[in-house]
């Protein structure tokens, strides 16, 4: 069994689709933890709709993505955890694929389908919808199944280090989880992947399971985009302060280094 951690903020429509795909796509009855990082009333209708299938961790106030994710992991009942953003869509049989491809002492990343070109050359680029309103879940599920058959790979590749994250809860705790000092969580993922790599975990990617990612649904205005860009720059500066140098990204295998 898997404990799924889904932090959510102010995107109830995205959360609804995320939960629908997660619940309908699973083979086993996994623990699904929705971490409500403030704005419970905004998400209340969606949470009540899926109440039978989920555990709700209501933080009552906005504590930030990193702390919210850490608290979600602390509440995981199973050793295997899957951390997923609420703007992701789960494919069919996602739990079986992940458990089959996972090996000990690793962090396994399911590949992603995105509608825009990405800096991660492993991602599959296909516009199946850039908003919740234009997305067809059944169409995605059928496309993803066909895609898996075309690019099926027997063993994962060492090109992980992107979200979503599938790993052992104990390994997550050993490396200290997300660093809660990163503004908006920007660059915290690079920091986390760096810690995992330095701790000896293999950073793996499976192409037998693709999640859809809408990419920055909440960044809808020039002001929000500017704020996000500034937060990212602040994140890189904090990483330099913490580690003594900026975190470097290898575009070939996505490994993070100093």
Give the role of each language-model region:
Residues 11-24:
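Short, well-formed alpha-helical segments that are part of the catalytic scaffolds
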Residues 115, 183, 205-224:
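Active-site donor/metal-binding and catalytic loop motifs
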Residues 59-76:
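Glycine-rich, basic loop-to-helix element that forms the pyrophosphate-binding segment
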Residues 92-134:
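Conserved donor NDP-sugar-binding/catalytic core segment of glycosyltransferases
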């Amino acid at each position: 069994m898997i404990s799924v951690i889904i932090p959510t903020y102010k995107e109830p429509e995205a959360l609804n689709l995320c939960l629908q795909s997660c619940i309908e796509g699973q083979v086993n009855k996994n623990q699904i933890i929705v971490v409500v990082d403030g704005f419970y009333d905004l998400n209340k209708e969606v949470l009540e709709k899926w109440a039978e299938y989920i555990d709700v961790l209501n933080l009552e106030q906005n504590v930030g993505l990193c702390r919210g994710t850490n608290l979600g992991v602390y509440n995981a009942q199973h050793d295997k955890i899957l951390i997923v953003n609420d703007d992701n869509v789960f494919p069919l049989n996602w739990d079986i694929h992940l458990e089959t491809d996972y090996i000990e002492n690793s962090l396994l990343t399911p590949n992603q389908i995105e509608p825009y070109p990405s800096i991660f050359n492993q991602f599959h680029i296909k516009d199946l919808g850039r908003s919740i309103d234009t997305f067809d879940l059944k169409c995605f599920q059928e496309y993803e199944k066909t895609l898996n058959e075309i690019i099926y790979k027997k063993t994962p590749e060492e090109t992980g280090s992107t979200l979503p994250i599938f790993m052992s809860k104990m390994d997550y705790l050993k490396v200290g989880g997300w660093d809660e000092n990163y503004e908006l969580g920007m660059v915290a993922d690079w920091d986390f992947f760096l810690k995992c790599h330095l701790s000896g975990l293999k950073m793996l990617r499976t192409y037998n399971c693709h999640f859809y990612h809408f990419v920055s649904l909440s960044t809808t205005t020039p002001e929000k985009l500017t704020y996000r860009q500034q937060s990212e720059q602040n994140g890189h500066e904090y990483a330099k302060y913490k580690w003594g140098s900026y975190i470097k990204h290898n575009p070939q295998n996505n490994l993070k280094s100093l």
